[in-house]
Amino acid sequence: MIRAENISSGEEQECGAILNWLLPATLLPVAAYAQEATVKEVHDAPAVRGSIIANMLQEHDNPFTLYPYDTNYLIYTYTSDLNKEAIRTYNWSENARKDEVKFQLSLAFPLWRGILGDNSVLGASYTQKSWWQLSNSKESAPFRETNYEPQLFLGFATDYRFAGWTLRDVEMGYNHDSNGRSDPTSRSWNRLYTRLMAENGNWLVEVKPWYVIGSTDDNPDITKYMGYYQLKIGYHLGEAVLSAKGQYNWNTGYGGAELGLSYPVTKHVRLYTQVYSGYGESLIDYNFNQTRVGVGVMLNDIF
């Protein structure tokens, strides 16, 4: 089957070193050939639907405006199986429940617009995903797992066209992902990644390959289950958005996939249904196979 701790000063230094490497080695060619997307002053929807970078290039009255990076949602879920073995050191593990509240918060901030031309931005993002045992009042409703995912990246808004598709986003950066736990439940990895997003009519396709760097002692076989890339597909059907994303290791046959459906109920809130099946829904479950179904609300979909 398609199977926090706070960031240390050492990790911050590593992030800076990686950025210094990324700029001259891989990003300047993109700056040289990408078509310019002029920074615009706007106060409404993004100029390019689904483009994270085009959205971040827009200027607002408030200089501290935060932008959505990934989706932001809250859903009530039920899983086919709970990974109690991974959390056996928690004193409440035997009483852990299969129903949980799952939510994701994902925001980005432009650090330097126009760093390599008007179509470029140096940005930072933070994504947090949590699994909350809200109904487990017997154990004081603990958080079973939380994943913290900061990124530092350089992005370009482009307008390249090929066979009906338009390449909208080119992004390269550094990603740290951890659950902020100490041993034996600590899970973390660091990656260099590239994200490419293209659109064609009502379709959106995004591919995000990565290269693992640094130590993975907490989870040495994580790529066996999480692979080396993520693929995301979206389709706009009227006001509804259908989405699918997943990762897969073709050598091992392990991976995981997430399906989503959202529909607006107000101007700012969407009804959201999500199904995840396979390995790697969270870091603590990277090598655990399950199917989880959830229903709730969403603030922003992929486009």
What is each PLM-predicted segment?
Residues 1-57, 303:
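Cleavable N-terminal export/targeting peptides
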